[in-house]
């Protein structure tokens, strides 16, 4: 699967369960660890867990074996390592505190085309 397709699989999985404020960062020129980061918010720890589980399920359904995941039990910040794509699902306060978009400033950013209604 192409990396851009995997990004879209992650975005679709997040949108399926109404993730908020989905942003993709192209970090190919910034780090050798991954090519893209997808960042999204869930409105509760339960939703963060559900969103993360859905991304993992959809990745596996598309033949991608996740390399690892962290934070699924806490529901505050789930990190999913899909290889060329790393997905961060967080509570809004956690996202604001760590401000990954600022940390990776200079990386090309794009928002998901379809944002779920609130």
From Swiss-Prot:
* A cellular component annotation (GO) from this entry: cytoplasm
Q: Which InterPro entries match?
A: Iojap/RsfS/C7orf30, NT_sf
An example of a Pfam family matching this protein is: RsfS
The keyword Phosphoprotein is assigned to this record:
yes
- What's an example Gene Ontology biological process for this entry? negative regulation of translation
Q: Where is the signal peptide?
A: none
Q: Which NCBIfam families match?
A: rsfS_iojap_ybeB
Summarize the protein's role: Functions as a ribosomal silencing factor. Interacts with ribosomal protein uL14 (rplN), blocking formation of intersubunit bridge B8. Prevents association of the 30S and 50S ribosomal subunits and the formation of functional ribosomes, thus repressing translation.
**Hey, which family's this protein in?**
Belongs to the Iojap/RsfS family.
What this protein is called in its record is: Ribosomal silencing factor RsfS
């Amino acid at each position: 699967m192409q990396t851009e397709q995997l990004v879209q699989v992650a975005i679709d999985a997040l949108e399926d369960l109404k993730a908020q404020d989905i942003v993709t960062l192209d970090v190919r020129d910034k780090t050798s660890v991954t090519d893209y980061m997808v960042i999204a918010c869930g409105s509760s720890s339960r939703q963060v867990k559900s969103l993360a589980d859905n991304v993992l399920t959809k990745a596996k359904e598309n033949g991608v074996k996740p390399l690892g995941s962290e934070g699924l039990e806490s529901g505050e910040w789930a990190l999913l390592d899909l290889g060329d794509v790393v997905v961060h699902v967080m509570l809004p306060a956690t996202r604001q505190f760590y401000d990954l978009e600022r940390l990776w400033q200079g990386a090309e950013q794009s928002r998901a085309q379809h944002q779920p209604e609130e």
